[in-house]
A protein has these predicted regions:
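Short, solvent-exposed segments of well-ordered alpha helices
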Residues: 2-12, 35-38, 62, 66-69
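N-terminal acidic leader/helix
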Residues: 2-31
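Generic structural concept
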Residues: 8, 12-15, 19, 41-45, ...
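Amphipathic alpha-helical interaction modules
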Residues: 22-54
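Low-complexity intrinsically disordered segments
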Residues: 42, 50-88
């Protein structure tokens, strides 16, 4: 990422798309999925908040490149987990 601003916008955009999918599942999915969708909505909001906060402040002792590579990898893992929950 070229800047923190770009990174934050990318995080917001991805979480916004995930949130829209979770809303669709809660409205149009099976009855059993609707209860899980509400918990998933809250987890998506927490995910966005956590990673935008982490993008704002680099951990002391780490180089910026290593920190942001770690941040991107952690975000990919969390997004994959949310997508797996949406698909199940």
């Amino acid at each position: 990422m070229a800047s923190k601003r770009t990174l934050k916008r990318a995080i917001h955009s991805i979480c916004e798309d995930l949130f829209a999918e979770a809303i669709a599942v809660s409205l149009y999915g099976a009855k059993g999925q609707q209860g899980n969708a509400e918990a998933l909505l809250f987890s998506i909001l927490r995910l966005e908040d956590e990673f935008i906060r982490r993008a704002s402040h680099i951990e002391p002792g780490m180089t910026a490149k290593a920190y942001f590579n770690s941040l991107a990898e952690d975000f990919r893992v969390q997004v994959s987990a949310v997508v797996d929950q949406l698909n199940s």
